[in-house]
Amino acid sequence: ACTQNSHTMMGRSIVKETTLNEYLKNPKSGNEDFKLESYKGKVSPSELNLYQEWEPSVHFWNMSIDLSKCHGCGACVIACHAENNVPVVGKQEVRKNRDMHWLRVDRYYSSDMTKDLAEEKGIGAIEMYKMMEEPSSEESLEVVFQPVMCQHCNQAPCENVCPVAATTHSNEGLNQMTYNRCIGTRYCMNNCPYKVRRFNWFNYKDNDNFDFNMNDDLGKMVLNPDVTVRARGVMEKCSMCIQNIQKTKLDAKRERRKIRDGEVSCACETACDTGAIVFGDALDSNSRISKEKKHPRTYALLEELNTQPSVFYKTKVRNKNKVNKNV
């Protein structure tokens, strides 16, 4: 049972990387600004915006993920499950593409197949992508790990298609789920370009077929009381650990002070032993996340869609002579 190819975003500029030598010469190497062709010529996606402009109010929660620091240990995934009462569905459900993770770690291997090579040899798109999934030879094999969760887009495609407004946007930049309003159409899951939304096919917490951690008295004692246990037929996804955000806001209000930088943390950030994940308020100009956002290595996933994510990534820097363009 493997989810590696279930939610693939192959064929797009998902992972960006460069070498240390190139990075020292040019901090933006491997992370050139993306431009779209238009009647005005080449422009950035934000210049072709069809949405109404949105401005955050008091806070603007953002997350940064450094691909150079992530080594794919999976601690963030386990922490997310424990903190947010995400059910363990087992191998049989995973084989049916019914996996349940708010956060996944995508693994990309370097490949000898490229788009240019496929075009030269007359190989079709489906066959090309199949060949791209085959790793290159052991001598030149490279791997990249990339954590992917809900990107909390500020122009979210999922929000437009929900017929009951079960997924909405907060004034702090979070994409929110209202579970008791969701009727399970799965339109949002279908319209999400990042494939991060999950559907509850069963009532996992009281189902003997899923004898893992939610259907006995002892298992229910370790559930987080601050997080709703979802029922059958509703969608769920990363909430940026909203319960921790709200608790910190209440603590700061009680003490009549502002929230300090680093005071709010997500479960994945806390569990990451390399410090690859940084979370914070981007409206605080002195915060670490604000500095990460302005870093020349920073880029957004699927920038060409102009979803304006609140999660961004930093280019992977390899300490070698030449970068492999075929990851």
Where are the predicted features?
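Non-ligating segments of multi-cofactor redox enzymes
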Residues: 1-327
